[in-house]
Amino acid sequence: MRVALSSEGVFPLAHGEATAVGASVSGTLQGEGILVGMPSLFVRLAGCNLRCEFRGVDGSVAYCDTPHAQRTSGGSVQEVAEVMQVVVEHLGALRHVVITGGEPMLQAEAVAELCQALKAGRDGLHITLETNGTIFGEEVAEAVDLVSVSPKRQKETFVEGRPSHDYVLSLQQWLDAKRGGRDALQLKFVVGRREDEVRLIDPLLSALEGWERFPVVIMPMGGDSTTMRASEPVAVEMAIRRGWRYTPRLQVDLWGGRKGT
């Protein structure tokens, strides 16, 4: 089976020179969520079913921080076995792999096969799937250790101010599939202004059952330090007031959000 990768593909890889994070070995740090700071290797797939935009406290608009992964053009198509081999060969001491995009679940069958191959190729490997939650896949849910769901309020997911039936159904399927473990799923919300709480977070949580057993993570909007700094106070205040976890974006703090980090 073949899988479409973004231009980053498996990253960051060391080929005799420093990687984008300035290291001489392959890997980076997970920048977000409950595993923030965890040494990891990333696999970025190509293609996304959303075109996200976010608004900040000053009315500024931020867009997807990985636009190069929105479409399949500009990347490569490889056999799952080839991707697995590259990952395993560059893991070194790493025990965490992150499957991200784009939206990986557009290639659910290939993702399931890749995760199964990775687990067979390296004992004790932990796999995180990063997804917007619009597409559920039972095989993928069974194959990964952590589902990192980042819900989005876009025209494809919300209708007349409420989350669509299909979106709620898909998110609920993810929650139900991972209900056996608290750290098997996280709900990671990008926050740019206070209105995001009543426009995105509360409507979604009120439509879902059993979300309380999983971590809710609040993350400031911004693929660059200037935008992120402006939204941090809102995210911090919301996390404290609601008793949720706050996450930084280490890839922005440490490396300016540049590609390959």
Regions found by a protein language model. Name each.
Residues 27-32:
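Short secondary-structure capping/turn segments at boundaries of alpha-helices and beta-strands
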Residues 1-26, 242-261:
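Short, basic/aromatic-enriched C-terminal tail that caps enzymatic domains
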Residues 84, 105-261:
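Conserved AdoMet/S-adenosylmethionine-binding subsite of the radical SAM
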Residues 34-36:
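A short catalytic or substrate-binding loop motif that flags glycine-/basic-rich loops and adjacent residues
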Residues 45-46:
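Aromatic-flanked redox-active Cys/Sec active sites in thiol-based oxidoreductases
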Residues 3, 8-10, 15-16, 22-25, ...:
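Conserved Radical SAM active-site core
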